[in-house]
Amino acid sequence: MNIDIVISADHIDEKRLINKTVIIIDILRATSVITTAINNGCKKVIPVLTVEEAKDIAKNSKEDIILGGERNALKIDGFNFSNSPLEYTKNYVEGKTVVLSTTNGTRAINNSFNAKTILISALINSKATAKAIDKLNEDLIIINSGTNGQFSIDDFICSGYLIDCLYNIRKDLELSDIAKTAHYIYMNNKDIESFVKKATHYSRLKSLNLEKDLEYCFQKDIIDVVPQYKDGYIIKSNI
């Protein structure tokens, strides 16, 4: 199994994704939100690029819609929820559709539509994602959403942890140089949150008093669910 990493949403080459399995990672916080919402019984998540598109879907839909997302880590005016996974509890999201728009994560998802399979991962479900990848048994591209188009160490080290979870299942992994680097960084910094504390995005969220979000997002493998993008929606994968 060949594994490569793309360092941000801006670095995605859509042609390269054709017929590939792709993993989207944005641990702070979009993929943590999506994983949490799906685990708590959300019917589906619709990832969109713009606030206007999200509001149009909510306006025209007959479904029970929750609008969620952020711009520059802040809740969008007129939306029900921000991009905090702690808001997407079972009593709010069960059986409902979440329309989500974020600065980085939903852009990475929307830029990956050419892929054969798109799975959503974060630290909170990495082992479950690794099991799904093993079942697919296909070459893999891990896409880091990044921060405003730039490299983000939090997504990168999460990629390294995901690779390590895969190594615990199978040994026939062929890593690109960047994938080897991500795995090396994780193996030498297994206390991920301590390593990431000086990162730009982490510091931004901490400055907004979002320590509880950070604490939640840096937990490993508390959820045994893998969301999958399919036909316009993100649902619970049956892989």
Swiss-Prot record:
Q: Name one GO molecular function term.
A: sulfopyruvate decarboxylase activity
UniProt organism field: Clostridium botulinum (strain Okra / Type B1)
NCBIfam families in the cross-refs: PRK00886.1-1, PRK00886.1-4
Q: Kindly give the Gene3D superfamilies that the UniProt entry links to this protein.
A: ComB-like
Q: Which cofactor does it need?
A: Mg(2+)
Its EC number(s): 3.1.3.71
Tell me what reaction this enzyme catalyses: (2R)-O-phospho-3-sulfolactate + H2O = (2R)-3-sulfolactate + phosphate
Name the PANTHER family for this protein.
2-PHOSPHOSULFOLACTATE PHOSPHATASE-RELATED
Q: What is this protein called?
A: Probable 2-phosphosulfolactate phosphatase
Q: Which family does it belong to?
A: Belongs to the ComB family.
Q: Per UniProt, which keywords does this protein have?
A: Hydrolase, Magnesium
List the Pfam families hit by this protein, alphabetically.
2-ph_phosp
